Amino acid sequence: MSREEQPYIVATDGIVDALTKISSVFSAYLSANIHILNKYINYLRRVTSLKNERSIMIKIVKKLRFFNDTLLSTDLAQLQTTYEGEEPELALNIQTFASYLVKCLETIDLLNYFLLKPLQKELIAKTLNFDLVFPEDITDTVEDTYNHFVKFTQWSIESLSIDDPLLDIEVVQFSLRCAEEDQSYAEETDNIFLQEVLPVKDSQEYETLTLQWLDVLNGKLAILGERFEKVADDWYKKFGKNRS
């Protein structure tokens, strides 16, 4: 469906409320990452050979905290901005909010890569200490959570038939390019990014699906929080607060 054929989706009070809740769960996602990073940074103080890597993590925490503060202070009533007396069009007004979510996710993507791959290799190579290495099974949870937050953001944009390269998400575009080169199809893969996004028919459908996504993201975030808490507890048992 082309943008011209897409129904005029009004930014209703219900949609604003649903997206405000989405903003809150994104904030909680950022907070979960900030919390585990702060604990990790504290324990890495004992590894002097990783001073530079620790500095990078401190910078990332500052960035995530800034993103989080901005989300918390943003009033999504701006989604109901009107132009020339017309009812507020969601596809027009949501793009600034969506672009901010994309920015947050691209940063978390870099964090996940750095934290779970290069940093872990450096930690082992420089210290031979496996006590501070993230357990391998947490990687799947981190990636699954990230993928669902990305998929929601992709859906929130594409379901309104918004076609703007400035709103593209790198991991989604990479998956699409690989699928095209391999001539694979959505029904033949479990790659969530290849699952088709259908345009919504009206404001009520957008609100309903957003609330369904909210439940999904809250569920994924709860699992991630449990895994992070388990890792933090293991660190505490190994090092103890008096030696951190």
Curated annotation (Swiss-Prot):
One of its GO terms (biological process) is mating type switching. Pfam families: She2p (PF11435). InterPro entries: RNA-bd_She2, She2_dom_sf. GO terms for molecular function: lipid binding; sequence-specific mRNA binding. It is found in: Cytoplasm; Nucleus. Keywords: Cytoplasm, mRNA transport, Nucleus, RNA-binding, Transport. One of its GO terms (cellular component) is cytoplasm. Signal peptide: none annotated. Belongs to the SHE2 family. Homodimer and homotetramer. RNA-binding protein that binds specific mRNAs including the ASH1 mRNA, coding for a repressor of the HO endonuclease. Part of the mRNA localization machinery that restricts accumulation of certain proteins to the bud and in the daughter cell. This is SWI5-dependent HO expression protein 2. The lineage of its organism: Eukaryota, Fungi, Dikarya, Ascomycota, Saccharomycotina.
